[in-house]
């Protein structure tokens, strides 16, 4: 644990030291920022805010992880596990980088097409499967302590899990600080699980990324000086999925990641209901004021009768949901 604390602190300090230079470079080059939702008026002031900040914390976390892995985990299965998880983090980070690059530098509003993004995500999932899952001999999903063996079909679960949660965290990254601290809470929970399983290699990766995200949050809390971009959010979602697989606690991510699950579900429900009502009644109707769900909260809280919620209030509410759901998982596992 002491090793993890040192590695996490190094990651935090490096991110905090490098990020101001990244922001300054971004501003000097007058690079266009992330597009804002016009329906949420308080977001319009953020236009031009530097994005792609995930590039910094991903590179820092990867460098520190590889350094500590070589120094302390160079023998046995740990190196393979660390390599497998870092591989999918960097691959998904690269996918997000391409998406951000096309949007910002090439002024292509949609970035990668859905087919291009999904294809690259599947390739990334396959690389993780063959780097980590196959050598580990994993072919079963752990459902509340009971293994459900899937055999070769497990590959489809891995792809669904990694692609699904990478996109879920991406959808969650919509207001200042929300995704970064939500993922910190999730990683802290997996750190506890890793300690109980004596999986100190996974603990190291969690601690290093927690440090990097806390260093990033210094500049990402409201009012944000930088956003993580798809480069950060896609990588973080893939990392959470990979860690849940590595710890053989896949089901826990549905609860630990309740915020990501509900954010994604809100979008799917909204689109489906709108299409259904448009076909049935001739006009589309909505369940939520706006999706993902954090925008619904911004536009009137839970009841809709309240005044608009500030970003801090939305953050606090959803972070609390993430913390409580994580505690529920730990209680189920260890009490």
UniProtKB/Swiss-Prot annotation:
It is an enzyme of class 2 (transferase). HAMAP family: MraY (MF_00038). It comes from Streptococcus uberis (strain ATCC BAA-854 / 0140J). This is Phospho-N-acetylmuramoyl-pentapeptide-transferase. The lineage of its organism: Bacteria, Bacillati, Bacillota, Bacilli, Lactobacillales. NCBIfam families: mraY (TIGR00445). The chain crosses the membrane at residues 3-23, 53-73, 78-98, 118-138, 143-163, 175-195, 200-220, 226-246, 251-271, 314-334. The keyword Cell cycle applies. The gene is mraY. Its EC number is 2.7.8.13. It is a multi-pass membrane protein.
